Every structure is written in C-alpha cells, then in structure tokens.
Regions:
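Extracytoplasmic
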Residues: 40-42, 61-62, 92, 137
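Structural microenvironment flanking redox-active thiols in thiol-disulfide oxidoreductases
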Residues: 78-117, 127-133
C-alpha cells in the first residue's frame, strides 16, 4: 500500500501545472513586432524575422536583453534551448529574450525547428552568416545587453544549466530571475 501511495504521489507531482513550457511544440512564433527597439541603428545589421514579419536592426534591440545565436544543426544549441525558453517564461517584462537562427539550408528549416522545440520568444534569421561579423563565428553565442543597450557580456559556447543562466543575468544585467 505504501508503495502504491508513493507512486501515486510521484505521478501527481510530476504533472504539476506549475511547470513552465520547456519545449512543447507551439503553433506560431512570437512576432518580431513584439521586440522592443530604440529606433536607432537602422543602418546596422539588418536581419529578417523568422516568422516573415519584416526585418530588424540588431543594434536597435532595447536592453535589457539576452540574444541567443543558434542553428538547428547545432547540438550545443539544442542542449541549452530549454534554458532560454525558461528564461523567457520566467523573466516576464524584466528583459527580452531573442533568438537568431543562422545558416540554415532553408528559412523554413529554422522556422519549423523553432515551432517543434517550443521556442516561444521572437526569432530573427540570418541566411548567410552575416551575424559572424557582429557576434563572432560559430554557435552557440549569447549576448547580454544591459539597460543602456551596451553589450555587457558575450558568452561563446553553451549555457548548459538554468542556474548558470540566472547567474549570468544577475551578474551582467543586474536582474534576479
């Protein structure tokens, strides 16, 4: 009887509604029009919106923000993906989380990947690797943009744990999540 009760409690708590979306498929991407911008840097690095909703200058993204440069073929990008989804879900209006999909065979590959993986934050698209001139080569790369729009920190390589993500946000953006 105790064993049954223990199994029942474990099953019940594992279905808790307090869990956040950690990658369940979604129907549509957050529109690029939801990205807050300063209105400046219109001549900067212009990238298409992955959802087809126009284009945006990366330098015009208003901070505080966390920008993830990723690709569907990148295993380290995939490993850190849940941390960005969770950050977006838990940060609310404290900061923006934005993805930049790079160097896909087709734009639709990145779009479908983002939908299937539940990437519920706005996504930009770089079809030809122009972001490497701004962010540096390779993926994953994460930029932490402070409230003044200054690059406070750039992490080259994966952020494997949510605790590390929280520490970086706290240290460089002075925001507790």
């Amino acid at each position: 009887m105790k064993r049954f009760l223990l199994i029942f409690i474990l099953l019940l708590t594992s279905c808790s509604s307090s869990a956040t979306n950690q990658g369940a498929p979604i129907d549509s991407l957050a529109p690029c029009s939801s990205i807050k911008t300063t209105g400046a840097a219109a001549d900067g690095l212009m990238l298409e919106c992955l959802d087809g909703d126009g284009e945006l200058a990366v330098q015009a993204i208003e901070g505080p923000a966390v920008i993830s440069v990723w690709a569907s073929w990148c295993s380290n990008c995939e490993a850190q993906r849940p941390n960005f989804i969770r950050l977006h879900n838990e940060a609310g209006d404290k900061l923006q989380v934005i993805g930049i999909d790079v160097e896909e065979q087709k734009k639709s590959d990145g779009y479908e990947h983002a939908l299937k993986r539940g990437m519920n934050f706005p996504q930009l698209y770089d079809p030809d690797g122009r972001t490497s001139n701004y962010f540096g080569p390779g993926v994953p790369i994460t930029q932490f943009i402070d409230k003044n729009g200054v690059i406070a920190f750039q992490k080259i390589g994966p952020i494997f744990t949510y605790e590390e993500m929280q520490e970086l946000v706290s240290e460089y953006l002075e925001i507790k999540i």
